[in-house]
């Protein structure tokens, strides 16, 4: 079943879906394993697993630090594929890879898609690769039936959104704020108008992330988006209180 179909099926029984984010190898793969267990047990619908990169341009300080520390501890792309294979076999929810194009390019584009497919991954988020620059990438995404997730930003024009939607499957990731992940700024006054533009540009489900960290944030998206994305906040929790803090937090979000 495609990622879009899985999410639409899940949405039938819920006001809004939850997607969470982990950085692979941070603070360790053992901790990742425990965190994912907590997330799944407490109702997360989809998990994006970030393959660490030294210069994650879309990520704020929390996720940047996690990327750098994971790399410093020796995390390799092959380990990330092995871990993904283990998780997709154990847990019956969709898993995505998130990373940057340099990782995909160095690994070999077709090989990356082949191995991701074999590992049970349902989609890919590569925020620094616009469709105009990724002809082969998007062709492989179609060939191997992995959803290439496209990101909309508050600065995206309606025309640009429609153009981007032509390359997307799975869902659209709508950045709630300008800047990087984990930002504390309030939602723009024009946020509802922005989401209306997102909805008008595509028939795909909409996920909203960047700075979503509380039940109030999630509740505010009901009726406007299909999925809320929580990233930096769960990493902060693990840093402060360990993996076991993630379960109660996720359970409190809806």
UniProtKB/Swiss-Prot annotation:
InterPro entries: Aldolase_TIM (IPR013785), RibuloseP-bd_barrel (IPR011060), Trp_synthase_alpha_AS (IPR018204), Trp_synthase_suA (IPR002028). Its EC number is 4.2.1.20. This is Tryptophan synthase alpha chain. One of its GO terms (molecular function) is tryptophan synthase activity. It is an enzyme of class 4 (lyase). Tetramer of two alpha and two beta chains. CDD domains: Tryptophan_synthase_alpha. It comes from the Bacteria. Gene3D superfamilies: Aldolase class I (3.20.20.70). The alpha subunit is responsible for the aldol cleavage of indoleglycerol phosphate to indole and glyceraldehyde 3-phosphate. The keyword Lyase applies. One of its GO terms (cellular component) is cytosol. Coiled coil: none annotated. The active site is at 48 (proton acceptor), 59 (proton acceptor). It comes from Desulfotalea psychrophila (strain LSv54 / DSM 12343). Belongs to the TrpA family. The keyword Kinase does not apply.
